[in-house]
Amino acid sequence: MIYKNSDFLKVIKMSTVTLKPDGLYIDDKRFDMLSGDIHYFRIYPGGLRRRLEYAKAFGLNTIQTYCPWNLHEPKKGEFNFSGMLDLKGFLELADEMGFKVLLRPSPYICSEWDFGGLPAWLQHEEMVVRSSDERYFTHARDYTKRICKEFVPYLATNGGPIIAVAVENEYGGYGYDKKYMNDLADVLRECGVDVPLYTTDGYFCDMFERGCIDGGWVGVNYRNESSIAINALRKFQPDKPAFVGEFWSGRAVHWCENFKRRDINEVAAGFKEGLEEGAYMNFYMFAGGTNFGFMNGANFGVTFNAPEGTPTRYIPMLTAYNCDPLLNEEGLPTPKYFACRKALYEFLGKDEPPMPEIDYKSQEVAPISLKKRVSLWDAADYGAAVKSKLPLNMDEMHQDYGYCLYKSVLTGDGKEKVLDLPELRDRADIYLDRKFVATVMRERDHQPIALNLEKGKEYVLELLVENMGRINFGEKIVEKKGLVTPPTLDGEVIENWECLSLPMTEISSLEYKDAADQTGPIFARGQFTAEPNSDTFLDMRDFGKGIAFVNGFNLGRYWSLGPQYTLYVPGELIKESNTVEVFEQYAIPADGKLKTSNCSIYNEE
């Protein structure tokens, strides 16, 4: 086979890939696979090579990655495989650097990613996702066929680096629809996937059985209990090599909880124990990356180390996918990297080789003056709003991400009224005549929102509602966003709304002006000079809540409640002259300055 690499044309020998009880064989030679997750879609273009260099220096020979359906097909039938979504480029770079690839292209990925990687437009129709429901499976089949065109030429059997392909993700912890799983596998095979197909699940109850496909390779996911998990896997599947699909080297972190790292020595010991058990080990994650834009997911549960009895609720993930991995968000080795590398070479009975020199630069930029500003109230074009007797949710407006602004007019009767937002998804700032009243977060206890409305006087009620990320795992994964049911005033439904979609995709085209007003909700813009190809971090500790852009690229959400206080700006995004834009929901700092840092800042335990 011949395919075009970014640097050269390359002719490659086709291989065979087979599974035996003692290992995975490539061309009848046992392959001692050691792998880790690095997700191309979480890393700004140009940043992959450094992370792969550190992976090679560690001792990895294989990279595992998901493929996010929601980014590759943002609208039905419209596909994107460019920029950060250049799957072919990732596969060619991995091959150039000597890595094999475990590819996980199936429709659902979880991965603390919005809607688990499913496209939001699926929720515009009635269907049962992750099932053999034909209304869902038709879309899943179409996507699978399309993405196969991207990666099938890169299978090992076609001379490429891909040695195995995953079917779905941790399905044993979600459903039990064998037809769905086997039909997905059949689509892959029909598209020419002739390397081993695999699934990965936890080892509790009957997860292996519920999540596997007929004749497939089963892997196990777990935190640290290597011997227990691997022995459970071998008991279920004695005829194939033991494969740890996800050795959880860290943990996902939500907003409003402290960033607590896992014990380094425990992780290194668990990793070494898995090697001693003779299993193929895969770090999840090896390099974390970033949930740029609005791509962070959410859970429905409790935060880490929550007191017993804490009620379950919606908890969104951070922008940074800095889930305490071996390489941090900016792609640099952590103490855990070196501890696990030491454990690897102790297992191999070899001296650790010296670390190679790998170029990296970061910078702190002079405080950025945000002189140009425009209030949301001036920018909001209610002429584009949809008028409706009852408020429309985001899905009814065919809006997938961002904010919505809802407006209605209330007439006072001289009595105090209580405003309630019964099904809010996910967070709302409440304004009366454009004066801030309160913030409401879904499933959180809050004081009744009392409104004192003078008799006969009209008031404009406006609700700025934010979709903070779709749930990525569990039974509550399907849900509408925005105002799902109408707000009430003393139990009576409020009617006659103007519903304005604010996807936050065009903020660079706003009419910014020199202004002193710092009160939110407000857009602000500034210019800064910096050294290209040198990382920096926006220090958002003086701000409240919102999103930030550099050179038109959405870096993601910030929130003063932490534990993440900085937004990562990849050096590859930075030019000599740069523009930063911020949407701040509450207030710009009094001095109008945005600071930066040369490293990330967290509230850590």
Question: What does each model-identified segment do?
Answer:
Residues 4, 8-62, 92:
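N-terminal carbohydrate-binding accessory modules
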Residues 31, 437-438, 555-556:
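Short hydrophobic beta-strand segments in globular cytosolic domains
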Residues 40-57, 76-95, 417-419, 423, ...:
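Aromatic- and glycine-enriched glycan-recognition loops and surfaces
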Residues 48-114, 185-190:
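Aromatic-lined substrate-binding rim segments of carbohydrate-active enzymes
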Residues 103, 107-283:
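Substrate-binding/catalytic cleft of secreted carbohydrate-active enzymes
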Residues 416-431, 461, 528-551, 558-559, ...:
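Aromatic-lined ligand-binding clefts that engage carbohydrates, nucleic acids, or primary amines
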